């Protein structure tokens, strides 16, 4: 069981450590001012060994008609006296300025993160680019974005330092109809001076209302790195399916 926990942490952690899906973390709220949440937790369990878990996940925005400030974080530690299963953290800050009250925004962002189990001592990046909302109806929204960012990464075991400028592109959508919802985000991030070195990822969720009381939810996540670190697969993916039964009126 512990082996499965470690493998799950490594797979999800590697994907998360390379491309953070900001789209599904955004707060889609037209209200001006402050909104969001600050989540923190701690748990401990004694079962032969003492296992404990810590996490801190802020997601806060401040929004006006022209300006949008957004802070996202995810800090987690899971371990025992003998072994560490998760020791990772990420903080992301983003500022967006609407252009002439239109569908375009100019964004600036920066990020810092670490992941002990993935040999990542430090990764930082900073970038800027455009975001375009090109479909906006009651039931359908489509967004596209393109930006350039510089990333710096230090590996902890061998002291390797990686630096690169990447071109980040994404397409996201939110579709809701009666009894159906479909959301997705696709990222493509080639390295500017080596276009054959690229990352591609996607997260897609489909919700289907079978009856008034029964819903089905399907999710697929994938990540592909054409030039991954040593001993890491080029492609990882995960799928999940669930059923929800509504009771009462």
Feature locations, PLM:
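Outer-membrane beta-barrel "beta-signal"
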Residues: 235-249
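Cleavable N-terminal export/targeting peptides
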Residues: 1-32, 248-249
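Short glycine/proline- and aromatic-enriched beta-strand/turn motifs that initiate or cap beta-hairpins
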Residues: 18-61
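Residue-level signature of outer-membrane beta-barrel architecture
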Residues: 42-44, 60-64, 97, 132-134, ...
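Membrane-embedded beta-strands of outer-membrane beta-barrel proteins
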Residues: 38-40, 56-58, 91-93, 128, ...
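Transmembrane beta-barrel strands of outer-membrane/channel proteins
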Residues: 40-42, 71-77, 91, 108-112, ...
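Repeated loop/turn-to-beta-strand initiation elements of outer-membrane beta-barrel proteins
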Residues: 34, 66-71, 102-106, 138-142, ...
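Residues that define the transmembrane beta-barrel architecture of outer-membrane proteins
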Residues: 32-34, 50-54, 85-89, 122-126, ...
């Amino acid at each position: 069981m512990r082996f499965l926990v470690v493998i799950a942490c490594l797979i999800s952690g590697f994907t998360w450590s390379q491309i953070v899906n900001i789209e599904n973390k955004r707060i889609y709220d037209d209200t001006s001012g402050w909104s969001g949440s600050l989540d923190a937790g701690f748990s401990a369990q004694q079962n032969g060994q003492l296992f404990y878990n810590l996490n801190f996940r802020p997601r806060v925005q401040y929004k006006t008609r022209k300006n949008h400030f957004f802070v996202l974080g995810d800090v987690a530690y899971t371990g025992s006296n003998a072994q560490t299963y998760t020791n990772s953290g990420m903080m992301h800050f983003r500022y967006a300025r609407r252009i002439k009250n239109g569908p375009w925004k100019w964004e600036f962002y920066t990020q810092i993160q670490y992941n002990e189990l993935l040999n990542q001592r430090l990764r930082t990046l900073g970038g800027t680019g455009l975001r375009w909302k090109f479909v906006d109806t009651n039931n359908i929204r489509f967004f596209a974005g393109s930006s350039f960012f510089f990333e710096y990464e230090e590996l902890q075991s061998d002291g390797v330092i990686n630096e690169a400028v990447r071109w980040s592109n994404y397409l996201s959508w939110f579709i809701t109809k009666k009894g159906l919802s479909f959301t997705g985000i696709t990222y493509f991030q080639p390295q500017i001076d080596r276009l054959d070195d690229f990352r591609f990822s996607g997260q897609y969720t489909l919700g289907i209302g079978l009856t008034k009381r029964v819903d089905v939810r399907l999710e697929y996540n994938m990540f592909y790195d054409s030039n991954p670190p040593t001993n890491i697969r080029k492609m990882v993916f995960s799928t999940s399916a669930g059923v929800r039964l509504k009771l009462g009126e």
